[in-house]
Amino acid sequence: MKSSILLDGKAISEKIRNRIQETLAKAKAEGKGIPTLATILVGNNPASETYVNMKVKACEKVGMHSRYIRLKEETTTEELLGEIRKLNLDPSINGILLQHPVPHQIDERKAFDEIALEKDVDGVTTISFGKLSMNSEAYYPCTPYGMVLLLQEYGIDVTGKHAVVVGRSPILGKPMAIMLTNLNATVTLCHSKTEDLPSLVKQADIIVGAVGKPEFIKAEWMKEGVVILDAGYNVGNVGDIEVSKAKDKSSYYTPVPGGVGPMTISVLLLQTMYSFLGQFSPKLESHVANR
């Protein structure tokens, strides 16, 4: 069997960011201005602060403005909705990101759904999810879309392949299952109540780890030649899949870190650029007709 190929999220991410930088420099030279991404952080979660700072720096690097709105831990749902409404009405703001998770007293779903569709560059609103499920143009959840772009950059055709997605969160597992379906894969969506998970994983041509548990998906469950996409990032720099043991039997695999993670922020920047240019992310299409 040929050696497995590492899906280099860092390299592909850099390629995407260079393209964004070139497009925005051209737009600025033509007098079209500069896009702005607004990020809201509620509370004092250290991990969230780190993620937000990474996004702010990434914006600056590609020539994008960022607006960082910091709200106190005790913020109510209504106060947060008020901040989002202000950003919805601000013509200088092209994208709005509400950093997840929010403190327990806030209705996160209500807050997500307050974001204007044309500024939902993180793909978190119910309407964006519905548009994705209908394979209409939309902004997509950034992590699953990043995985799809990785597959496409490496020329991996999922048509007719059996993809097993482990994890059903509304911003990761579920949208990934829909995206793969839209690209003509046959998808099994698994979760914590799934019976005999190892036998399902054994059938997978493509395995997606999106369960949030360190190395939960074992190497021994997988068949030779599988494509491994690990969206997890846990303590100890490990994902949701036993990649260190499974990579030798894979055809392609994402490392942790350096695989899916860099793609997430790049997709956020990409979709903010699309919003600035007045368009949605392109509809997911395969070379095989939908039927």
Curated annotation (Swiss-Prot):
Highest taxon of the source? Bacteria
Indicate yes or no for the key word DNA-binding: no
Pathway(s) served: One-carbon metabolism; tetrahydrofolate interconversion
Q: Would I find Amino-acid biosynthesis among this entry's keywords?
A: yes
Which Gene Ontology MF annotations are present? methenyltetrahydrofolate cyclohydrolase activity; methylenetetrahydrofolate dehydrogenase (NADP+) activity
* Cysteine-cysteine disulfides: none
**Biological process annotations from GO:** L-histidine biosynthetic process; methionine biosynthetic process; purine nucleotide biosynthetic process; tetrahydrofolate interconversion
Could you tell me what reaction this enzyme catalyses? (6R)-5,10-methylene-5,6,7,8-tetrahydrofolate + NADP(+) = (6R)-5,10-methenyltetrahydrofolate + NADPH; (6R)-5,10-methenyltetrahydrofolate + H2O = (6R)-10-formyltetrahydrofolate + H(+)
Q: Which keywords does this Swiss-Prot/TrEMBL entry list? A: Amino-acid biosynthesis, Histidine biosynthesis, Hydrolase, Methionine biosynthesis, Multifunctional enzyme, NADP, One-carbon metabolism, Oxidoreductase, Purine biosynthesis
List its EC numbers.
1.5.1.5, 3.5.4.9
Instruction: Please tell me one Gene Ontology term that the record gives under cellular component.
Output: cytosol
Q: Where does NADP(+) bind?
A: 167-169, 192
One Pfam family assigned to this protein is THF_DHG_CYH
What does the subunit section of this Swiss-Prot or TrEMBL entry state? Homodimer.
Q: What function is annotated for this protein? A: Catalyzes the oxidation of 5,10-methylenetetrahydrofolate to 5,10-methenyltetrahydrofolate and then the hydrolysis of 5,10-methenyltetrahydrofolate to 10-formyltetrahydrofolate.
The similarity comment for this entry is: Belongs to the tetrahydrofolate dehydrogenase/cyclohydrolase family.
Q: Which PANTHER family match?
A: C-1-TETRAHYDROFOLATE SYNTHASE, CYTOPLASMIC (PTHR48099:SF5), C-1-TETRAHYDROFOLATE SYNTHASE, CYTOPLASMIC-RELATED (PTHR48099)
Do you know which HAMAP family this protein is assigned to? THF_DHG_CYH (MF_01576)
Q: What is this protein called?
A: Bifunctional protein FolD
Q: Name the species this protein comes from.
A: Leptospira biflexa serovar Patoc (strain Patoc 1 / ATCC 23582 / Paris)
